[in-house]
Every structure is written in structure tokens, then in C-alpha cells.
Design a protein with these regions (language model features):
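Alpha/beta catalytic cores of group-transfer enzymes, especially the acyltransferase/condensing modules
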Residues: 11-13, 40, 102-255
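Alpha-helix C-cap/termination motif
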Residues: 25, 80, 149, 153, ...
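NAD(P)-dependent dehydrogenase/reductase Rossmann-like domain
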Residues: 176-177, 216, 255, 271, ...
Length: 313
């Protein structure tokens, strides 16, 4: 029996039209989206299908939209996968989708949590503006050193998303992030790309959001996951509800340790493990191939993707 690891994408993967074809072809996907609409109290699925784009990309909408897409795919393929799930992992907000896949949280509850998460992150970003930038072609250790130097005046610049061996996202106060980017270029970075975000995610600037999110997480009806979920903050498997709550709150101010998470997932899966990315796009599949070059990975985002996968299963 093939060991399966589920992968769930994070913010940035949203686009107008997302999951529309899934809802039209698969009743399980439509039912998942309808249930999330009812829980949130507004037609998120309409925003996903038809836009407008500026509203869909707002943090408080983009986060539940991506989770809705991932969980709609899982509702279709999860029960039909021939293989034992050994782990799940999600990038940033995708960690919530991973807990849904592991049976620790209903999709509707997770959507409400990430909607709240997005609102709190947006608020924190308004109260203390921050920014993020992707550093390409430079080792993480060099990026971290540049951030330490840029932060020496008291402003914040940190390595926030450790996405690949030579792809790191930095986060913090705008001036410090700009300085860190310049220092990264001086150290040999190929490119530094500013990101269009509403705050300094995964940095200490998100502390007010993390504190309030912790309250919402404590009230959420978590169960122990049926299989381990690899936490962004530690890159270690989580097997109980209490630890899941704590680490999801910690996640807002901690780096996303994606390289280490994928290495740990590969260890849990063992030789021949199959990784399945569920949700919009295929970014995580691309990152995985750079981290674990011999990994077998499939991305399921569209109705055609899902249909082909089910035919071959």
C-alpha cells in the first residue's frame, strides 16, 4: 500500500474562477463550498468563482477561499485514495487545511478560523505596517545573517518563509526589509522581489494577531488528528489537539520551516511515498521537487486534474 502525504497551499494561490469547475462536476466539492458559505454567512464561493479580484485577494477573503478550495478537493479524492495517509502539511494558512484532511477539524470550522485569522492579520498590518520580500538564489544562512544586520537598529527583519534551499521570504518593518534585501544582493542573491502583502506575516509584528487568534483556537472543536500534521513552526509532526492549537497560534510570529517540513514528511513517508497537493496551483509541488528531488508528487487543483487522478487510481 502506497504511503500518502497531503500538501495544502497557502496565501497567494488564489485567483478568480478557483474551484468553480470542481463545484460543477463533483457534488462533494459543491457541498463543501455550500457549507462553508453558510458558516461564514456570505457567499464566499461566488467571490471565488466570479470575483472581483481585489476583494478575493484581501487577506480575510483569500485565506478562507484557499482553504475552501483545498478542502473541496479533499472531499472528492480523500475517501477514494488507495493508500494510507502518513502525514499532511500545509504552507502557512494551508496548515489548517492539513488538519481538515487529518480529521482534526471540520472544513466549516477551519474556514471560520482562517477568516478570523485573516481579519486579525489585516488589522495588525494596518496598526503596524510591514512588508515582505522573496530572496532568490541565496542560501538561507546568508539571508538570516543579512536580516540580523538590518535589524541592528531595532527595526525588525527576519527570515519568515524558508521555502527552498535558495528561496527565502523575509518579513518585517519596511525600511529594515529593504535594507535586508540590499544586503542580500550584496551577498550574492540573484533577485529580491517585493511581495504585495498587507503585513509582515510570520514576524513579531504579528504578535497582536497571534494573541487574539490563540483565544479563537482555544474555543475551536479540535480533535486529535488521525495522522500526523507537520507544524510550520517546528517542522515536527503534531499528534494531539492541544499542541495543534498552540502551534497554530505560534505560527503567526514564527518562520514557516518548509524545507525542514518536507524533509520530515519524506522521512515519515519512506521510500516510494506519494505526495498529493490539493488546492489551487502547483507551487508546493515545485518546491518539493527542489527539496526532495526524487519525490513523487501530484497536484490536484482543477476538475480535470481530479478526474484524471481518479481514473488512474
Amino acid at each position: 500500500m502506497v504511503a500518502t502525504v497531503w500538501l495544502c497551499p497557502g496565501q497567494g494561490a488564489q485567483k478568480v474562477g478557483m474551484a468553480k469547475d470542481l463545484a460543477e462536476r463533483f457534488p462533494e466539492a459543491r457541498a463543501t463550498l455550500d457549507a462553508i458559505d453558510r458558516t461564514l454567512g456570505f457567499p464566499l464561493s461566488t467571490l471565488m468563482f466570479d470575483g472581483p479580484e481585489d476583494q478575493l485577494t484581501a487577506t480575510e477573503n483569500a485565506q478562507p477561499a484557499i482553504l475552501a478550495h483545498s478542502t473541496a478537493v479533499f472531499a472528492v479524492v480523500g475517501p477514494r485514495v488507495d493508500g494510507a495517509a502518513v502525514a499532511a502539511a500545509g504552507h502557512s494558512l494551508g496548515e489548517y487545511s492539513a488538519y481538515v484532511a487529518a480529521g482534526a477539524l471540520p472544513a466549516t470550522d477551519a474556514a471560520a478560523l482562517v477568516r478570523r485569522r485573516g481579519e486579525l492579520m489585516q488589522k495588525a498590518g494596518t496598526e503596524r505596517p510591514g512588508t515582505m520580500a522573496a530572496v532568490l538564489g541565496l542560501a538561507t544562512a546568508e539571508v538570516e545573517a543579512a536580516c540580523r544586520e538590518a535589524s541592528s537598529s531595532g527595526a525588525v527583519a527576519v527570515a519568515a518563509n524558508l521555502n527552498g534551499p535558495d528561496q527565502t521570504v523575509i518579513s518585517g518593518d519596511p525600511d529594515a526589509v529593504r535594507k535586508a534585501g540590499e544586503l542580500c544582493k550584496a551577498r550574492g542573491a540573484k533577485r529580491v522581489v517585493p511581495l504585495n502583502v498587507s503585513g509582515a506575516f510570520h514576524s513579531s509584528l504579528m504578535a497582536p494577531a497571534a494573541n487574539q487568534l490563540r483565544v479563537a483556537l482555544e474555543r475551536a472543536a479540535f480533535r486529535d488528528p488521525a495522522f500526523p500534521v507537520i507544524a510550520n513552526a517546528t517542522a515536527e509532526p503534531v499528534r494531539d489537539a492541544g499542541r495543534a492549537r498552540r502551534l497554530l497560534a505560534d505560527q503567526l510570529t514564527a518562520p514557516v520551516r518548509w524545507v525542514a517540513s518536507m524533509q520530515r514528511a519524506a522521512e515519515l513517508g519512506g521510500a516510494g511515498a506519494r505526495f498529493i497537493e490539493i488546492g489551487p496551483g502547483n507551487v508546493l509541488a515545485g518546491l518539493l521537487r527542489r527539496i526532495v528531488p526524487d519525490a513523487s508528487v501530484t497536484s490536484l487543483g482543477t476538475a480535470d486534474d481530479v478526474a484524471r487522478f481518479l481514473e488512474a487510481a
